[in-house]
């Protein structure tokens, strides 16, 4: 089963200085499944890297490098928000979470996250990566 990485997991994997880099990397290395990204999570990574001082071209190259890994699968954003399960969504920060969870469901996959609230709300597809902090 392929696991869609939410933006925080993707960023933690790419940025060695991230507080959860080791936890995310250890989790991914211990897993033998494939992982997926989508335009929404890739865009979040690019935005984070540019905000951190990298050029847009360098950030795009990071996304390309992620996509070139053998376990990577790209999931296009092919869902309408009209079909997204929104039960439990009470704030604007949960809208993207609901979309990513629905995208994972549509691919018979899972959604990896560092967010315990997301994991609780979407327990049918979410995988909470354990951290020490």
From Swiss-Prot:
Task: Summarize where Mg(2+) binds, as residue positions.
Answer: 6, 97
Sorted UniProt keywords: Hydrolase, Magnesium, Metal-binding, Nuclease, Toxin-antitoxin system
Disulfide bond entries: none
Which segment of the chain is annotated as a signal peptide? none
EC no. given is 3.1.-.-
Its needed co-factors are: Mg(2+)
Fetch the Pfam families from UniProt. PIN
- The residues covered by the PINc domain are 3-122
- What superkingdom does the record give? Bacteria
Which EC class heads this enzyme's classification? hydrolase
Give the matching InterPro entries.
Mtu_PIN (IPR006226), PIN-like_dom_sf (IPR029060), PIN_dom (IPR002716), VapC_family (IPR022907)
Which GO molecular function entries does the Swiss-Prot or TrEMBL record give?
magnesium ion binding; RNA nuclease activity
The answer on whether this UniProt entry bears the keyword Protein transport reads: no
Activity regulation: the record says: Inhibited by EDTA.
Please verify whether the record's keywords include Lipoprotein: no
GO biological process entries: negative regulation of growth
**Function recorded in the entry:** Toxic component of a type II toxin-antitoxin (TA) system. Its cognate antitoxin is VapB29. Has ribonuclease activity.
Entry similarity comment: Belongs to the PINc/VapC protein family.
Descriptive protein name: Ribonuclease VapC29
Provenance organism: Mycobacterium tuberculosis (strain ATCC 25618 / H37Rv)
| Gene name tied to this protein | vapC29
């Amino acid at each position: 089963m392929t696991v869609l990485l939410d933006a925080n997991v993707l960023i933690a994997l790419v940025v060695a200085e991230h507080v959860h880099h080791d936890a995310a990397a250890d989790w991914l290395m211990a897993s033998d499944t494939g992982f997926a990204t989508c335009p929404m999570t890739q865009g979040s990574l690019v935005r984070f890297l540019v905000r951190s001082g990298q050029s847009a071209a360098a950030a795009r190259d990071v996304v390309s490098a992620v996509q070139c890994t053998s376990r990577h699968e790209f999931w296009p954003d092919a869902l309408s928000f009209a079909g997204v399960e929104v039960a439990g969504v009470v704030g604007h920060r949960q809208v993207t979470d609901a979309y990513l969870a629905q995208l994972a469901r549509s691919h018979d996959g899972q959604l990896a996250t560092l967010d315990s609230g997301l994991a609780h709300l979407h327990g049918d597809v979410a995988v909470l990566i354990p951290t020490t902090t």
